A protein has these predicted regions:
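Residue-level signal for well-ordered alpha-helical segments
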Residues: 8-12, 29, 75-79
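N-terminal, Lys/Arg- and Ser/Thr-rich interaction peptides
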Residues: 1-18
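Beta-strand elements of well-folded, non-transmembrane domains
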Residues: 4-8, 56, 98-106
Length: 195
């Protein structure tokens, strides 16, 4: 379990193409990405988010951001010619408690490309990866900086031990509408399907 927070967050709604508008709360895929930033072993394990608790009231703010109005391609982009100011509707002062379980992939079920650089031992078990995560999360270690929707909005985090007394989540019930759960990269890595 992790408690994550930050000054700003933007979990962009895909149906709004031009201006960035955030979902009301963190998406499950963004929550999974925070766990993966701390520990990611592509062929050995994956994270499955089981519960997201909202700890701070949902507050909105708008800002204008400079963005590049062109797709990166083979030719270089002169940023000064392609710069655009766009409005963003963001979340302010967010705090979440995210619960996830580690799904271990047994050695026999891993694809052949998993063994190109590293030959795992046959006695690998999920506890090895759970302890790696626990150690890394409690010491503030990560492979990449976790973020809250957009890389500009860095996430602070704290590992929550099972013995800690937890503050109750926000006592509010609200319809969040349709929300992207995650992307399925199993079938096609180039064009994943929405889940």
């Amino acid at each position: 379990c992790l408690e994550v927070w930050g000054d700003w967050a933007c979990f962009s709604r895909p149906e709004l193409k031009v201006e960035r508008v955030s979902y009301d709360v963190i998406t499950p895929s963004a929550a999974r990405a925070i766990f993966e930033a701390i520990l990611f072993k592509r062929y050995a394990m994956r994270w499955q988010v089981t519960k997201i608790e909202v700890l701070n009231p949902i507050k909105w703010t708008t800002i204008r951001r400079n963005e590049v109005g062109a797709l990166a391609g083979k030719s270089s982009i002169f940023i000064e010619d392609k710069r655009q100011q766009k409005n963003s509707l963001l979340l302010q002062g967010v705090r979440y408690r995210i619960h996830a379980k580690l799904v271990f992939i047994p050695v026999k079920d891993r694809p052949k490309e998993a063994f190109i650089k590293h030959q795992p031992s046959d006695d690998e078990n999920p506890m090895k990866y759970y302890q790696m995560f626990e150690r890394r999360a409690s010491q503030g270690q990560c492979f990449t900086q976790p973020y809250l929707g957009c890389r500009e909005f860095a996430a602070n985090w704290k590992y929550i031990d099972n013995t800690e007394q937890l503050a109750p989540p926000l006592a509010e019930d609200r319809d969040l509408g349709i929300m992207l759960y995650d992307m399925d990269f199993e079938g096609n890595v180039q064009k994943p399907n929405a889940m």
